[in-house]
């Protein structure tokens, strides 16, 4: 019911079915990250088909475009990010690269990292902003990791995909271990492990944030995911300035850390309110102080008044 568009001639496939269900599935057996999200389904069939799918996403105004695939060489090894590999895949004037640039100007492209833990570089697509820097504001890469956590947060993770490497500045981790839908029937499910199933969690998270914060554009939502990621289980050695002086630490192994959707939905930094005179004050600072003689009159009179509260990301 939540499929808005299907690219013509798309084959039935267990992998794609599982990925879609992680992003937006809803049944008695499992619930995806954003069960109310609408999906436009495309497929990997060469760069022309990929360009068509990307252009469709742009036409539909999709918040996120999930990509649970990557290029490999003739031996099946990850095609690392490099100008040479970019030229091999895209050549000059390739419609797919143009479609990605156009879509990422407004939406967010999400790519799964390689599942090879031994990779020493990021794949071409996960780290494509290294080649085309204009993509970075609309790009995320997602690795797969199993977290060890308690009520205070994540203590450590077991990385079971490639590290973030060159994609670190726009990389997140999620747990790509899911019981998800398969293509066998409309009641069939199977166990899945891989970065392919971590990426749609981030894409679904962007959809949920779009519902929660309708005034924010997809690039703003992307920044919320990066700024709220749990990076307490490692020592950052690089810092990304998110906005308004707010920085978030990352490193080449874990990127910005583990996806934390709850934190992304809560205020980030200092909640604040703009007063009538234009001054900005912290939300926990007293705005009105009344004497006991007023009783609850001021509280009651202001109970129906709406105020706009922003956080450090506005």
Over which residues does each language-model region extend?
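Subtilisin-like serine protease catalytic core
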Residues: 1-49, 59-60, 73-76, 104, ...
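Sec-exported extracytoplasmic/periplasmic mature domains
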Residues: 24-28, 58-59, 70, 101-105, ...
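Extracellular S/T/G-rich loop segment that most often corresponds to the catalytic His/Ser-adjacent loop
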Residues: 1, 128-211, 215
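Hydrolase catalytic cores
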Residues: 20-23, 42-44, 176-250
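Substrate-binding/access-modulating region of protease and related hydrolase catalytic domains
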Residues: 14, 25-26, 42-136, 185-200
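Structural recognition of the beta-strand scaffold that forms the well-ordered cores
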Residues: 1, 20-22, 31-33, 38-43, ...
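C-terminal subdomain of the subtilisin-like protease fold in secreted/lumenal serine endopeptidases
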Residues: 63-66, 141, 211-314
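Surface-exposed intrinsically disordered loops and tails
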Residues: 2-10, 74-95, 102, 119-134, ...
């Amino acid at each position: 019911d939540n499929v808005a568009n299907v690219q013509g001639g798309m084959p039935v496939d267990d992998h794609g079915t599982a990925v879609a269900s992680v992003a937006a599935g809803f049944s008695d057996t499992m619930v995806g990250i954003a069960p109310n999200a609408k999906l436009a389904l495309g497929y990997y069939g060469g760069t022309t088909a990929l360009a068509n799918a990307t252009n469709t996403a742009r036409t539909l105004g999709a918040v996120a475009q999930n990509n649970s695939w990557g290029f490999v060489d003739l031996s099946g090894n990850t095609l690392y990010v490099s100008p040479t590999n970019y030229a091999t895949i895209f050549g000059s004037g390739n419609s797919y690269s143009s479609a990605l640039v156009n879509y990422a100007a407004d939406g967010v492209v999400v790519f799964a990292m390689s599942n090879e833990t031994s990779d020493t570089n990021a794949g071409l697509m996960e780290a494509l902003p290294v080649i085309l820097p204009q993509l970075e504001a609309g790009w995320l890469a997602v690795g797969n990791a199993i977290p060890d956590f308690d009520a205070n947060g994540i203590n450590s993770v077991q990385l079971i995909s490639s590290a973030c490497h060159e994609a670190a500045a726009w990389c997140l981790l999620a747990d790509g271990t899911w019981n998800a839908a398969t293509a066998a029937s409309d009641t069939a499910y199977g166990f899945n492990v891989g970065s392919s199933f971590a990426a749609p969690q981030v894409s679904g998270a962007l959809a949920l944030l779009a519902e929660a914060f309708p005034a924010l554009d997809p690039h703003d939502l992307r920044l919320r995911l990066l700024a709220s990621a749990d990076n307490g289980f490692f020592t950052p050695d690089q810092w990304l300035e998110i906005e308004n002086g707010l920085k978030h630490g990352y490193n080449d192994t874990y990127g910005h850390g583990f996806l934390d959707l709850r934190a992304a939905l809560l205020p980030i930094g200092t909640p604040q309110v703009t007063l009538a005179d234009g001054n900005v004050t912290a939300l926990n600072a007293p705005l009105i102080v009344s004497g006991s003689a007023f009783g609850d009159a001021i509280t009651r009179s202001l109970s129906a008044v709406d105020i706009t509260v922003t956080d450090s990301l506005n």
